């Protein structure tokens, strides 16, 4: 499972924000500023390609009337304000994995940017800020890639770290001879972070219609107007795709996909993905597409010896969730512990409405915070919870989990499995 996760292609769905000073700096021209922002993201994507990460610009915002936070020369304060704005405003209206602020302000000291370490996929911490410190856009792009590197678990390079160039992306200071290369240390740190945190948001491939930047033929991502994208003509190894035009070669039906074989669609009924478990179904090709559409058993079908019900292709049960939070010996706490969810306090609640925590109704207590008993001699507390103010949703009972016979959790309520949920 771990190796499968590490090998999977990762996608960072990025929103890039430019502040009011940037708007003034580029002559109040939205076109000029947008072009600079697109150029920066294209370079960032090139840099991260070597790490098997595609950076897709899914949102671009320019504060052309006034700043939405108080941008100031203290980078620490500005980062905190920007991250808070992202969590409370931007995330509510635009789905994305990471946000970066490009600012025209001059930060105190030698700082050109700042970001939270290992913040990717975390609502409060997947953010960075970068000063537009140089006319040359690729130097600003390297600075932003550096900050995103922090978000992806990479720390500053030490003297012993090497990448085959004079300076690597995660160098502690700006270099006049920067490179697009990550050091051996950065690669190790990124891998260790992926193993430890296994951030899920970066596994989700954006739709081509989600991308707001102009299509770039040769960036390995099929965008609007393209039929395929196998990289540059020099690097493309795909016989189905014309690298110069990002169009399929004559006679080819497809270039990639589980239902594509030697540039042709596989026959209808060909199995393209085996069933993973009892809540999944074997997926079949249609004969009309290269895609292998994921199918699964209907929600509410009993699974794991009637301990759970299928939900969107998985079988969520409380014991598995306790093990994921507290280790292999963990078990679900006694029913009395779940009564804490009646309180509606900072951790014991069923759901949030407009940022207000709603206490559980008595029949719904098993659809709020999860209570576990970690079976270790050191732990005497029978009602252990996982609660972090930075990620309050972690440690809640997962949607679709069995909460009573014939019932499953949906939006903090224990509902009948015969009704849609």
UniProtKB/Swiss-Prot annotation:
Summary of the function given for this chain in its UniProt record: Snake venom zinc metalloprotease that induces apoptosis in vascular endothelial cells (VEC), without degrading the extracellular matrix (it cannot cleave collagen) or inhibiting adhesion of VEC. Has also fibrinogenolytic and hemorrhagic activities.
Disulfide bonds listed in the record: 121-201, 161-185, 163-168, 217-246, 228-241, 230-236, 240-263, 254-260, 259-285, 272-292, 279-310, 303-315, 322-372, 337-383, 350-360, 367-409, 403-414
Glycosylation sites: 312
Gene Ontology biological-process annotations: apoptotic process; proteolysis
CDD domains: ZnMc_adamalysin_II_like
Cofactor(s) recorded in Swiss-Prot or TrEMBL: Zn(2+)
Record text on subunit structure and interactions: Homodimer; disulfide-linked.
Top class in the EC scheme: hydrolase
Family named by the database record: Belongs to the venom metalloproteinase (M12B) family. P-III subfamily. P-IIIc sub-subfamily.
Primary site of residence: secreted
GO function terms (MF aspect): metal ion binding; metalloendopeptidase activity; toxin activity
Residue sites binding Zn(2+) per the record: 146, 150, 156
Summary of the tissues where the protein is detected: Expressed by the venom gland.
Cellular component annotations (GO), alphabetically ordered: extracellular region; plasma membrane
UniProt-recorded name of the protein: Zinc metalloproteinase-disintegrin-like lachestatin-2
Subcellular location: Secreted
Keywords assigned: Apoptosis, Calcium, Cell adhesion impairing toxin, Disulfide bond, Fibrinogenolytic toxin, Glycoprotein, Hemorrhagic toxin, Hemostasis impairing toxin, Hydrolase, Metal-binding, Metalloprotease, Protease, Secreted, Toxin, Zinc
UniProt-annotated binding residues for Ca(2+) 1: 216, 219, 221, 223, 226, 229
Active site: 147
Comment on bound cofactor: Binds 1 zinc ion per subunit.
């Amino acid at each position: 499972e771990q190796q499968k996760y590490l090998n999977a292609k990762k996608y960072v769905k990025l929103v890039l924000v430019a502040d009011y000073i940037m708007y003034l700096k580029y002559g109040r021209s939205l076109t000029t500023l947008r072009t600079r922002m697109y150029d920066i993201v294209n370079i960032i994507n090139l840099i991260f390609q070597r790490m098997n990460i595609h950076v897709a610009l899914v949102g671009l915002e320019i504060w052309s009337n006034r700043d939405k936070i108080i941008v100031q020369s203290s980078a620490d304060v500005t980062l905190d304000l920007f991250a808070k704005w992202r969590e409370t405003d931007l995330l509510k209206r635009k789905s994305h994995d990471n946000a970066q602020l490009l600012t025209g302000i001059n930060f105190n000291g030698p700082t050109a940017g700042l970001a939270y370490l290992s913040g990717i996929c975390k609502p409060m911490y997947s953010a960075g800020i970068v000063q537009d410190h140089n006319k040359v856009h690729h130097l600003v792009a390297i600075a932003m890639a550096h900050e995103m590197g922090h978000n992806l678990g990479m720390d500053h390079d030490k003297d012993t770290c090497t990448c085959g160039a004079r300076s690597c992306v995660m160098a502690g200071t700006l270099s006049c001879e920067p490179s697009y290369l990550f050091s051996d240390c950065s690669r190790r740190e990124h891998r260790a972070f992926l193993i430890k945190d296994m951030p899920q948001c970066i596994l989700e491939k954006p739709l081509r219609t989600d991308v707001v930047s102009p299509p770039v033929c040769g960036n390995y991502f099929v965008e609007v107007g393209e039929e395929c994208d196998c990289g540059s003509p020099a690097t493309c190894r795909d016989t189905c795709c014309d690298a110069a035009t990002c169009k399929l070669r004559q006679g080819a039906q497809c270039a990639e996909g589980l239902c594509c074989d030697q540039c042709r669609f596989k026959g209808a009924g060909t199995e393209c993905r085996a069933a993973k478990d009892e809540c999944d179904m074997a997926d079949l090709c249609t004969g009309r597409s290269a895609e292998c559409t994921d199918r699964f058993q209907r929600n509410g079908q009993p699974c794991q010896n009637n301990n759970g019900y299928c939900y969107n292709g998985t079988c969520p049960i409380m014991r598995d969730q306790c093990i994921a939070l507290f280790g292999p010996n963990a078990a679900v706490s006694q029913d009395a512990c779940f009564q804490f969810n009646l309180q509606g306090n900072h951790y014991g609640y069923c759901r949030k409405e407009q940022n207000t925590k709603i206490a559980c109704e008595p029949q719904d207590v098993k659809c709020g915070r999860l209570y576990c008993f970690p079976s270790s001699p050191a732990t005497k507390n029978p009602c252990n919870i996982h609660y972090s103010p930075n990620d309050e949703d972690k440690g809640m009972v997962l949607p679709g989990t069995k909460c009573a016979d014939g019932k499953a959790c949906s939006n903090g309520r224990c509902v009948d499995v015969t009704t849609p949920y």
